[in-house]
């Protein structure tokens, strides 16, 4: 985590932290004004929101990175597919070398590597067979492709809360219950793209890491969610579900980490959560190397971490599945048995019935696609 990010996520920065962030206060004011103006233009219909021709469920957040949005998107897409829907996920594709519209998966299998699709689309494509994944900056264009070319009849808009150019039938906003708003400021002074008052646009609040939140904070967030949306929130924890090798194949039970001395390698917005996961699994984290979010590890970086791990007596270098999909297959193969990957999924603690009801209402309320016009009779 960089020095700036440390200021962002420190809820009570103290005098030195406040002083370090003071120059950014001047930049926060125009960002706040621009965000408010843009929101008002959409609220009043002066900026249009395109209809997709299929129900759209947006998964987003208020802050930048690390809220647990990807596990939530996985869970929502799986539940929609379980209802018999032909699902497509629309993603910005952060971390990709390309910025054009592209199909990462047509539902039959991954078509693009993470370097071209972005790490989150690559992960979603790998984890969700039968679900199409499209990526690019213009999500309305992706929606048309998904509906018209791939036959999708339910769309999941990944990181979509601020992407209001595409209309949606349900806005799910994910908050990290352990630290939902950081220092409370907007970019660049803080981590937030919008203030908490923006939750009034949401249809459902999802509290990730609810198991790590203090009881009084959890109660306050539940009240905030009900006041904003009229619904109780969904609450989840990041549950480790599999231990994989560098090629993302099963590599034994998670219990194998218990008592093992390991090195943690990550490129995440908030790497501390990954360290807590490893410690909860009983691993002894002797070494931790954290890179910026969406970072693609080079051969030199991976080799250096492997050497440090060996020198520290570590059995494995352990990384996340999102990091592993970015890893060049040749590098993963070279690491061999020295590399392990922990998969996590969103385990719902409360609100499964609320989620199902919200999805059902969104599917029922969405405008149905217009039938294609009949050809004139000769």
Swiss-Prot record:
ATP binds at residues 63-70. InterPro entries: LpxK, P-loop_NTPase. Pathway: Glycolipid biosynthesis; lipid IV(A) biosynthesis; lipid IV(A) from (3R)-3-hydroxytetradecanoyl-[acyl-carrier-protein] and UDP-N-acetyl-alpha-D-glucosamine: step 6/6. One of its GO terms (cellular component) is plasma membrane. Pfam families: LpxK. It comes from the Bacteria. The keyword Phosphoprotein does not apply. It is an enzyme of class 2 (transferase). GO terms for molecular function: ATP binding; tetraacyldisaccharide 4'-kinase activity. It catalyses: a lipid A disaccharide + ATP = a lipid IVA + ADP + H(+). Belongs to the LpxK family. HAMAP family: LpxK. Transfers the gamma-phosphate of ATP to the 4'-position of a tetraacyldisaccharide 1-phosphate intermediate (termed DS-1-P) to form tetraacyldisaccharide 1,4'-bis-phosphate (lipid IVA). This is Tetraacyldisaccharide 4'-kinase. The lineage of its organism: Bacteria, Pseudomonadati, Myxococcota, Myxococcia, Myxococcales.
């Amino acid at each position: 985590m960089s020095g700036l990010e440390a200021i962002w996520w420190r809820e009570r920065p103290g005098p030195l932290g406040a002083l370090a962030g003071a120059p950014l206060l001047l930049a926060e004011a125009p960002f706040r004004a621009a965000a408010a103006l843009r929101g008002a233009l959409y609220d009043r219909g002066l900026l249009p929101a395109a209809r997709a021709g299929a129900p759209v469920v947006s998964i987003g957040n208020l802050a930048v990175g690390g809220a647990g949005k990807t596990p939530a998107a996985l869970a929502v897409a799986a539940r929609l597919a379980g209802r018999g829907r032909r699902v497509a996920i629309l993603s910005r594709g952060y971390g990709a070398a390309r910025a054009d519209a592209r199909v990462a998966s047509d539902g039959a299998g991954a078509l693009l590597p993470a370097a071209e699709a972005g790490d989150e689309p690559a992960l979603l494509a790998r984890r969700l067979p039968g679900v199409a994944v499209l990526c690019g900056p213009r999500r309305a264009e992706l929606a048309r492709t998904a509906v018209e070319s791939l036959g999708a009849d339910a769309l999941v808009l990944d990181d979509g809360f601020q992407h209001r150019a595409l209309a949606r039938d349900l806005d799910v906003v994910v908050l990290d219950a352990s630290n939902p708003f950081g220092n409370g400021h907007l970019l660049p002074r803080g981590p937030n793209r919008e203030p908490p008052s923006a939750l009034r646009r949401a249809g459902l609040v999802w509290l990730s890491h609810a198991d790590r939140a203090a009881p009084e904070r959890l109660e306050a967030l539940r009240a905030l969610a009900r006041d904003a949306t009229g619904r109780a929130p969904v609450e989840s924890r990041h549950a480790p579900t599999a231990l994989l090798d560098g090629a993302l194949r099963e590599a034994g039970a998670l219990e194998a980490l218990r008592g093992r001395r390991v090195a943690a390698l990550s490129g995440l917005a908030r790497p501390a959560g990954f360290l807590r996961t490893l410690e909860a699994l009983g691993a002894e984290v002797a070494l931790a190397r954290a890179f910026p979010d969406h970072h693609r590890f080079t051969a030199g970086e991976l080799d250096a971490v492997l050497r440090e791990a060996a020198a520290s007596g570590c059995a494995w270098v352990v990384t996340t599945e999102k990091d592993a999909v970015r890893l060049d297959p040749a590098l993963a193969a070279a690491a061999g048995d020295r590399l392990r990957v922990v998969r996590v999924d969103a385990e719902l603690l409360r609100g499964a019935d609320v989620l199902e009801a919200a999805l059902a209402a969104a599917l029922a309320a969405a405008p149905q696609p217009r039938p294609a016009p009949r050809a004139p009779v000769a």
